[in-house]
Amino acid sequence: MTIALTGGGTGGHLAIVRCLLESAIKKNIECVYIGSQNGQDKAWFENEVRFKEKFFLSSKGVVNQSKFDKISSLLHTLKLSKDCREIFKKYHIQAVFSVGGYSAAPASFAALFSHLPLFIHEQNSKSGSLNMLLKPFATKFFSAFEKEISPYPVADKFFDNARIRKELKNIIFLGGSQGASFINELALNLAPKLQEQNIKIIHQCGKNDFEKCKKHYQSLNIQADIFDFSLNLEEKMKNADLAISRAGASTLFELCANTLPTIFIPYPYAAKNHQYFNAKFLQDQA
């Protein structure tokens, strides 16, 4: 059996794709990945040899676009959907699993046009526009935040590296796969005080602020473990005793799996303020 996994753009979506791939392999199901040339899809999966095949299409988002550009993007998505239908035929795809994000649109629509089962996983407490649009047509809609709760897919390695923390020696600052300027500034401002207390810093700063943060730590003569992006985030978490983090859903549940105490600072401009509601969901479970 061969299925198509589609979606991405950011690490939150792509982490789910990776979990689904690992689960499918255990069940002897082959997977074709359909993502985008834009976003982080290629950084995550261009060299992933476990996919039967990978396709990175010219799909793009429509957020903050003019009406004309949105119509143009829709027509382009329909064209890419036709390409996806050809992929389905060539690889004998029997079902499509979408994790949302703009890169999921072509294959998701193609699944409907091809009368293939469409499964959707929504990561956040507030559904994205594409997932909301396709939800009525999906064979199954999965969410950890709805009344019919579905377990959130988290890679085994986050559980495997879990431990009980008894003292504060290392703090990890997590701004998400794209980095967060506010958390970067917070980390840099706290760095001298943390050094005085002999607390080491692990800092995911994102690509855009990497050089700036690196130079700042060097000017302070602080040996911080600074990185922009990592496919082995569980190793960074394992070494930390406290996290200060954005509240994207994948990061949130990975931190829970790792049993890492966390102070969440939700990104206030996220669509539908979903990071706030992600974090509030955890608070409400207490």
Regions found by a protein language model. Give the residues of each.
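Active-site-proximal region of nucleotide-activated glycan assembly enzymes
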Residues: 2, 29-32, 51-53, 112-161
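Conserved nucleotide-sugar phosphate-binding/catalytic loop shared by glycosyltransferases and other
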Residues: 3-8, 25-75, 209
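Short amphipathic alpha-helix
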Residues: 13-24
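An aromatic- and histidine-rich active-site surface loop
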Residues: 39-43, 95-114
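Donor-nucleotide binding loops and adjacent catalytic segments primarily
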Residues: 39-49, 156, 163-243, 276-280, ...
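An amphipathic, basic-hydrophobic alpha-helix
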Residues: 66-95
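Acidic donor-binding loop of glycosyltransferase active sites
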Residues: 93-95, 238-253, 260-261
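Structural loop-to-beta junction motif characteristic of Rossmann-like glycosyltransferase folds
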Residues: 116-117, 241-242, 259-267
